[in-house]
Amino acid sequence: MVDNAERMPFRDGELDVVTSTFLFHELPSRARQSVAREMLRVLKPGGLLVVLDSAQLVESTELRIFLENFAASMNEPFFASYLREPLERLFGAEGFSLRETATCFPSKLVVAAKPSG
């Protein structure tokens, strides 16, 4: 589906799974919060969120120079703030329960669930 991730055309609790591939680093911080909130809204209780995106500074200090240079060299206006705002913290703040994280350089995978109750 291609649509506005901040206002998805689904009812509350309609979906079992929501996925995102390389979206969050393209968004300003405020939009990342809004999209995470919207993902929670459309998921059924116990539903899963699966996100694949660029690695962040929390994954490895060894990657810092590579990741910070990437933003400048690839004209990524929101990448610098994305690097410093861990997705795990974002999803937790919006109400998700973290299930799994994995680093697959230069990417990260985050799996979280909407609480059942």
Q: What are the roles of these predicted feature ranges?
A:
Residues 1, 19, 50:
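Conserved Rossmann-like nucleotide-binding pocket used by diverse enzymes
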Residues 110-117:
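C-terminal lobe and adjacent flexible extensions of AdoMet/dcAdoMet transferase-like proteins
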Residues 2-7, 106:
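Conserved SAM/SAH-binding loop
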